[in-house]
Amino acid sequence: MQVSLITCTSNSEETLEDCCNSICAQTYGNLEHIIIDNNSNDNTLNILNKSKINNQRIFQQKSKGIYGALNEGMKMSNGKIIGILHSDDELIDKEIIEIISKKFLENNLDVLFSNIFYTKKNNINKITRKWTSNLNEGIQQNNDLIQRINNGWMPPHTSLFFKKNLLNEIGYYDESFKISSDYDFIIRLFKQNNLKIFFLNKFSVKMRSGGISNKSFSNIFKKMREDIIIMKKFKLNAFITILIKNLSKIKQFF
């Protein structure tokens, strides 16, 4: 079963080599790496061309935003399973994709999510926060997950792996949302009936701080506005929870 990892790059030379090395080190052989590059003019392409990833495909295009680029990557992918790995993030160890693939095969899964580490922007080995689901490992009940989402819970999209054919049912990232499209996407995904969704109680990714959603005060408030639109769309009642979660990000600036 082929797994496709989608990475978007835009002058990503500072962190890209570590990202690629974490993919190259994987013990799982049937792995595809799709890169959507925003016409980088630094050393990004040299790093990609020198990487030792066996099945890597690079597509250059003028920026359509992060979600437009991810959509292009998913459309270009050949894998049965899709995951997202940003250019400043790393897979946790060399066996994680093999473990994830095995879970899909053993349990005939549609979706899998796991735990992730958040790290300092300039030191990915310095853990600043841990996201854990507080669930027991195994197949989850859709209704239970939707209830959690209704209370403000949401797994990070970088921890998520899903079958590509689900895109035919739920669609791709909504590009009208510039910051919170992953929130909208995951709700649509988890609201599908009769999916086999598995929680892997293992850390899968180290994710650097400083992403688009929390790089500035302005983006934090833009994200809150988009979150509210999405909550109204799905008739969720998590306004206070989302407000607190977004406002809590402000402390990183002090």
Regions found by a protein language model. Give the residues of each.
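Glycine-rich, basic loop-to-helix element that forms the pyrophosphate-binding segment
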Residues: 60-77
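A conserved acidic beta->alpha catalytic loop
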Residues: 37-46, 86
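Catalytic core of nucleotide-sugar-dependent glycosyltransferases
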Residues: 207, 215-241
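Short beta-strand/loop segment that forms part of the nucleotide-sugar
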Residues: 31-39, 59-62
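Conserved nucleotide-sugar donor-binding catalytic segment
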Residues: 136-222
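Short aromatic/hydrophobic "clamp" motif used to bind/position activated sugar donors
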Residues: 82
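Conserved donor NDP-sugar-binding/catalytic core segment of glycosyltransferases
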Residues: 94-130
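Short, well-formed alpha-helical segments that are part of the catalytic scaffolds
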Residues: 11-25
